[in-house]
Design a protein with these regions (language model features):
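Surface-exposed, interaction-prone regions used to assemble/regulate multi-protein complexes
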Residues: 1-147
Length: 147
């Protein structure tokens, strides 16, 4: 079952926000950034099951023109003696956009935490050993519920 939400209309859509789901795959092509989310059968509070009971997974496709930015939360490493004197420096760094697909294949599981929607803009919050923000220009979003 497919649902389409347009982000370039006069009013923003009311769309479900899946949260705390594991991303099994990410694909990037010329038009779409696609996240494939899977349900956790052990989790009684699964957000995909909450929005569509009986769904096994969800495919989210953001229609974009490869115009996106990726930021990852990092902490600088300092020698132990300096850490006692100074707090570690925490900041966000740019991640190469070609590494977006590799994030799902990392040894740490990649979680889809939430997303924020604005006019023609989406900010996706991911998590894999640290916070990752994906900011992109998108004119519509497709949800495909897998049963």
């Amino acid at each position: 079952m497919k649902e389409t939400y347009y982000l370039n209309k006069d009013t923003l859509p009311v769309m479900p926000v899946p949260h705390d789901n594991i991303i099994s795959n990410i694909t990037v092509d010329d038009e779409f950034v696609t996240f494939i989310l899977e349900t956790d059968p052990k989790d009684k509070d699964d957000s995909i099951q909450y929005y569509k009971p009986g769904a096994k997974g969800l495919i989210i496709r953001y229609h974009t023109e490869r115009d996106y930015l990726i930021y990852q939360h990092r902490k600088t490493r300092r020698p132990r003696i300096l850490c006692k004197l100074f707090r570690p420096r925490i900041h966000y760094v740019d991640v190469d956009e070609n590494k977006l697909e590799a994030l799902a294949r990392d040894k740490y599981s990649l979680d889809y935490i939430e997303h924020f929607v604005g006019y023609n803009t989406v900010i996706v919050n991911l998590y894999a050993k640290s916070s990752i923000y994906l900011r992109m220009q998108a004119d519509y979003v497709e949800y495909e519920w897998l049963f």
